[in-house]
Design a protein with these regions (language model features):
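Surface-exposed acidic/polar loop and edge beta-strand patches at domain peripheries
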Residues: 1-128
Length: 128
């Protein structure tokens, strides 16, 4: 089962939380802002459901976060030293956002993008 819930607005775009629940009761909550995992809820040995991620409660918390909590990162993962690299003889200068370095895609990396979501519910296990 997939549940879609309004989460807030970012740059005039609607942001949603998507809750995917499987046949065993496990669920994951994702948002189209940064393709971010908000929570993963799994049963413990006694059947009690627990969130093992500990994500933020509000969209604003993700927007204003210093880190990349639960978000997809990119175009690169980790740091590009001094925000510069060469590829096939072409020099590239990247946005500096971590001391002297470029980190995880810069100022507007994948973590700040609004992702299009395609929901698939043609079996017992939902996916987006």
């Amino acid at each position: 089962m997939i549940n879609k819930e309004f989460f807030g607005k970012y740059l005039s775009n609607d942001i949603y939380k998507y809750t995917l629940t499987n046949s065993k009761g496990m669920s994951v909550v994702l948002t189209n802002f940064g393709a971010t995992i908000v929570s993963i809820n799994v049963p413990d040995k006694d059947g009690n459901i627990n969130d093992v991620i500990g994500g933020y409660e509000t969209l604003d918390s993700y927007i204003n976060a210093d880190g990349y909590q639960g978000a997809i990162i990119g175009r690169v993962g980790n740091r590009i030293c001094n925000g510069k690299f060469s590829l096939d003889g072409v020099d590239y200068n990247l946005y500096i956002n971590n001391g002297p370095n470029h980190l995880h895609g810069g100022k507007v990396g994948f973590d700040k993008r609004i992702w299009q979501v395609l929901s698939i519910e043609d079996s017992n296990e939902p996916s987006i």
